[in-house]
């Protein structure tokens, strides 16, 4: 009887300890990225996110980063999470618009939201819930993980002044913005960051846009093209994403799930500040040391771009793709609301500062 009682007691004790023991188990996740190793802002942001999760969890969840091409090709990063080759990826949702065009809205939209507006939509105006619906189909979960702010319009071998100058232009530009440029006559393609310079150098591209001065300086585009158009009207605010395997994420204890969420939020803010601080410094270097010409798109191109953007958005909103349609409707409703704030705060303030405040 004593032996039987001891056995029963041991079983109860083991059951009691099992849940805490599991919650303390150490795991390692693999994060694949679309960014080159040590890439300013975005690639470093992925590394920082991995470090945050590892540190905040006390090592219970450690994340090992594989930069573009180290484990899978950069534009197969999401597929690696879907098929289980990695637990996590870091990139931009509009790279996957072939899976659902609605995903483009979670990166940035031509003539759409600024960075703060976009974050407001995703976090407080229903965007995250729709994003979850789209990614549910693939067994993954997406989180905002960084933001570049308003991007540069691109690098061009020759100056472009009219819409006619765009006809047949071989241009690297992804997402809905790529569709806009295609409507304006460009021949559009998408390439990963590390592939763009070679394409420009080989002459297979006439123009390329990626992010802005901070990243573009590192990629060396100025060595091939000197005409740098700013700002972008197709990427007024561009967010990056961290994607996790939904089954792996849900298997985590509640505190580790919250650590992943909080780490993504913290790194989103960190990347945004990093980009704002270093873009102007990099631009000065491009101009002063490398002879880059900073140009603005003509009103003709801006107006044609706006019209084409409206056509692209209308096409998504009127499509048979229910989730893409739902995404577009939610985005446009949020943009309409958020413009009422911008119209009486940010926009007039920036005009007034530029016009009247000359203090240095």
What positions do the PLM features span?
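Bacterial Sec-dependent N-terminal signal peptides
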Residues: 1-4
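Basic, amphipathic alpha-helical recognition segments used for DNA target recognition
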Residues: 126-127
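N-terminal signal peptide c-region/cleavage motif recognized by signal peptidases
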Residues: 18-20
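N-terminal secretory/targeting leader peptides
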Residues: 6-14, 23-118, 130-360
């Amino acid at each position: 009887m004593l032996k039987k009682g001891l056995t029963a007691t041991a079983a109860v004790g083991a059951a009691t300890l099992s849940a805490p023991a599991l919650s303390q188990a150490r795991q390692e996740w693999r994060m694949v990225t679309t960014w080159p190793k040590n890439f300013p802002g975005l690639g470093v942001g992925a590394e920082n996110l991995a470090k945050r999760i590892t540190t905040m969890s006390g090592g219970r969840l450690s994340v090992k980063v594989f930069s573009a091409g180290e484990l899978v090709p950069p534009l197969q990063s999401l597929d690696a999470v879907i098929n289980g080759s990695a637990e996590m990826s870091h990139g931009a949702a509009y790279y996957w618009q072939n899976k659902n065009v609605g995903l483009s809205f979670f990166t940035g939209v031509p003539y759409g939201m600024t960075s703060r507006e976009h974050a407001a939509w995703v976090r407080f105006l229903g965007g995250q819930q729709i994003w979850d619906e789209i990614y549910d189909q693939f067994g993954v979960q997406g989180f905002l993980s960084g933001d570049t702010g308003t991007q540069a319009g691109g690098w061009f071998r020759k100056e472009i002044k009219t819409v006619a100058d765009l006809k047949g232009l071989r241009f690297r530009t992804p997402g809905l913005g790529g569709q806009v440029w295609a409507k304006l006559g460009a021949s559009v393609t998408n390439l990963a960051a590390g592939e763009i310079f070679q394409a420009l150098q080989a002459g297979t591209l006439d123009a390329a846009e990626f992010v802005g001065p901070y990243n573009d300086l590192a990629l060396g585009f100025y060595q091939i093209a000197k005409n740098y158009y700013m700002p972008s009207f197709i990427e007024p605010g561009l967010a990056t994403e961290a994607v996790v395997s939904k089954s792996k994420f849900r298997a985590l204890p509640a505190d580790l799930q919250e650590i992943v969420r909080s780490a993504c939020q913290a790194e989103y803010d960190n990347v945004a500040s990093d980009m704002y601080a270093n873009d102007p410094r990099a631009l000065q270097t491009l101009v002063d040391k490398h002879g880059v010409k900073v140009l603005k798109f003509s009103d003709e191109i801006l107006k044609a771009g706006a019209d084409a953007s409206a056509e692209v958005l209308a096409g998504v909103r009127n499509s048979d793709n229910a989730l893409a349609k739902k995404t577009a409707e939610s985005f446009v409703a949020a943009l309409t609301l958020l413009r009422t704030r911008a119209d009486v705060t940010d926009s007039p303030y920036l005009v007034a500062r530029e016009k009247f405040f000359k203090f240095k």
